[in-house]
Amino acid sequence: MNQKKPPVSKPPSKFAQWLSRASGSLWLRTVKIVAGILLVVLLVFYSAAALFTDQGGFTVSIKDAGKGNAKYGAISLSETADFASPTVRLEAQEVARMTNISELDIPADVDNYDGAHNGANYMAYTFYLKNSGEAACDVLTDLRIDGVVKEADEAVRVRVYKNGVPTTYAKLAADGTPEPGTTPFEGGKKVLSELSEDLAPGEITKYTIVIWLEGNDPECLDNIKGGSVKMSLMFSVVEDSETQSET
């Protein structure tokens, strides 16, 4: 019985060789392109993550605490409405690495939590102010910027909830007009100065402070990468002439 000879393999044609080399070269170029795209994406992500490194600090305090007339000047702070641990100074947690967001990214219920409840890209802090004295008093609220690096305050937003009512503050735009939906800073490094009159004995005011970097602000540019903002909120009892005569 005759056996068939095994087929003789023919060497690949020149076209097949060229096609093989072309396919390998195309695959290599594709890999390089994909790797390049991934590198760009990672660099963009890193730049965004480093946009607002070490955001700064935020403190709340009472001016000249303990130096005034205890009857009229006794106001205190607490992170809880029951004032289980009253104090004259509070400090919010910092946001270590903060990138720009939109105000639409702020949760609708951000005012519903006590103490520090930061998001990934915003600072949120809720506390309470109480008149612990024996008579009504006027309280001055002074919110100011204590330090800025790389002009980060140009695009910062500060939203203050007072008993659930929000007001958003921002620096004036480059053309001198208010940023949309905001109340301008009072000037310089002062964000706001507000007098609350006739705070009754035992009356409690709830505050929530939210701070973020507004990505829709035209001033939110690359030059503020790595910037920071440090702010403080101070309360003080304003004594009228009658009160001063009694002290």
Describe each model-derived feature in a short phrase:
Residues 143-147, 234-236:
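Acidic (Asp/Glu-rich), glycine- and aromatic
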Residues 2-106, 116, 239-247:
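Short, polar/proline-rich extracytoplasmic segments that appear immediately after membrane translocation
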Residues 21-35, 101-112, 166-204:
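Extracellular adhesion/glycan-binding regions together with long Ser/Thr-
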Residues 55, 153-155, 226-232:
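Short edge beta-strand segments in beta-sheet-rich domains
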Residues 105-137, 189-247:
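C-terminal, structured domain-capping segment
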Residues 141, 157-161, 239-244:
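Short C-terminal domain-edge/linker segments immediately following a structured domain
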Residues 135-145, 152-155:
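Short, hydrophobic/aromatic beta-strand segments
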